[in-house]
Amino acid sequence: MGTALITGGSRGIGAQTVRAFAKKGWRTAFFYHASEAAAQALAAATGAFAIRCDVSDSQSVKQACAEALRVLSHIDVLINNAGIAQQKLFTDITDDDWQRMLGVNLSGAFYASREVLPGMISRRYGRIINVGSIWGQVGASCEVHYSAAKAGLIGLTKALAKEVAPSGVTVNCICPGVIETDMLGSFSPGDLAVLADETPVGRLGTPEDVAEAILWLADEKSAFITGQVVGVNGGFGE
């Protein structure tokens, strides 16, 4: 198998993606920001390389990508998964809220892709997989800044896919629906039950559901797929 770099890899979807790639034999590195203990435990369990990085800071991303290239030698697959969420009325969103949301959820993918792409282009092979959200497709009340950032990530995916396809690089976006991660920590059991009822398959999604879709897009069998937005949502919002 090849090499993979996963941003936001210490918890939730990212951590499960690290586990899935490592289990398949990929040499894997992942970025984490604040979750030091979780990152080190995951690295010990999987053999993946844990690298501290603030994806909203271009210099931090530059340094972290250089470290990833040092330990992996090259990067075949980049998974831009790092993300944050926040629920707020639109009129209560501060400048800092807005900048932080776009910095992590959108700029982080731009910075990491910019660092990794030259190597992919020179080798004429690469996979970039962005992790968006259903809210980037349909919008979410009280999450305007989050929805806007994820919609931007979809736009980045579609435009970059066209630009780098002649160089052998594919770019796609996974858009999860309601997934059981700590991002749902503010939801009551009743709220979660309602969301499960509103999902046609009758349950919430799991990080494993998303990780398997990411693995599929990383596989050589998906070589003719680029510029696509793939919903992993159990029919929710469709």
Regions found by a protein language model. Name each.
Residues S133:
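Residue(s) in the substrate-gating loop at a strand-loop-helix junction
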Residues L89-F90, D97-L102, L184, D191, ...:
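Substrate-binding pocket helix/loop in short-chain dehydrogenase/reductase
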Residues I84, T91-F110, Y125, I129, ...:
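Catalytic Tyr-X3-Lys loop
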Residues K24-Q40:
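Conserved glycine-rich Rossmann-like NAD(P)H-binding loop of the short-chain dehydrogenase/reductase
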Residues S113, A149, T157:
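Active-site helix of classical SDR
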Residues S10-R11:
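Conserved glycine-rich cofactor-binding loop
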Residues P118, K162-E163, A223:
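Alpha-helical segment proximal to the catalytic Tyr-Lys
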Residues A165, T170, I225-G227:
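Short, small/polar-rich loop/turn modules that mediate ligand/substrate recognition or access, typified
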